[in-house]
Amino acid sequence: MSNKDYKKLYLVTDYRIPFNELLEKTKEALIGGVSIVQYRAKNKETKEMCKEARALKKLCDEFGALFLVNDRIDVALAVKAHGVHIGQDDMDVSIAREIMPKDAIIGVTVHNKEEALKAIKDGADNLGVGALFSTNSKDDATLMTLETLREIKSVSNIPLYGIGGITPYNLNKDILENLDGVAVISALLNSDNIREKSKEFLNILSK
């Protein structure tokens, strides 16, 4: 298996954690092997978001990790993020593709095959698929069935990242064979040992 074939561990930040603490937690996750960080912040002023995103981008650069911004293309551009992640209620992928640099990564959350096909057609680089399990990070998350995940996998030629309530203990072979990695919030950031928890995830992802 080459490096590019390894399933990736993707950290999504939690805006409920004080930022200085979040920065330290993110560093531990990067040391543990996280290779993608998505900055997600709700109800914050743009100036504060840019300051936080810039600090996280610098940290990701130190570890050679990709840094993405959730929803806010303006913030992503301001801090020279590697890309953005957008949801179904955000800007169309085709418009985001026009605004972002040509080499920018655009990830899109999808919930079914139809949304996946549209995102791919419009120029998405990867898809977040879920929620695979119940999650405290998003109140309105609808659970995705294994059948739907397989349908999305069957029509996708870009990486799929599982999202929603994922832990090292609920990932099974049926789920993993349809994913290129997993995106995690609570299972990492609420861990007593983030570095070791990251390694635990990667050990499961490498099997």
UniProtKB/Swiss-Prot annotation:
One of its GO terms (molecular function) is thiamine-phosphate diphosphorylase activity. Binds 1 Mg(2+) ion per subunit. Pathway: Cofactor biosynthesis; thiamine diphosphate biosynthesis; thiamine phosphate from 4-amino-2-methyl-5-diphosphomethylpyrimidine and 4-methyl-5-(2-phosphoethyl)-thiazole: step 1/1. It catalyses: 2-[(2R,5Z)-2-carboxy-4-methylthiazol-5(2H)-ylidene]ethyl phosphate + 4-amino-2-methyl-5-(diphosphooxymethyl)pyrimidine + 2 H(+) = thiamine phosphate + CO2 + diphosphate; 2-(2-carboxy-4-methylthiazol-5-yl)ethyl phosphate + 4-amino-2-methyl-5-(diphosphooxymethyl)pyrimidine + 2 H(+) = thiamine phosphate + CO2 + diphosphate; 4-methyl-5-(2-phosphooxyethyl)-thiazole + 4-amino-2-methyl-5-(diphosphooxymethyl)pyrimidine + H(+) = thiamine phosphate + diphosphate. The keyword Metal-binding applies. Its cofactor is Mg(2+). One of its GO terms (cellular component) is cytoplasm. Keywords: Magnesium, Metal-binding, Thiamine biosynthesis, Transferase. Coiled coil: none annotated. Pfam families: TMP-TENI (PF02581). 4-amino-2-methyl-5-(diphosphooxymethyl)pyrimidine binds at residues 38-42, 70, 109, 138. CDD domains: TMP_TenI. Its EC number is 2.5.1.3. This is Thiamine-phosphate synthase. It comes from Clostridium perfringens (strain SM101 / Type A).
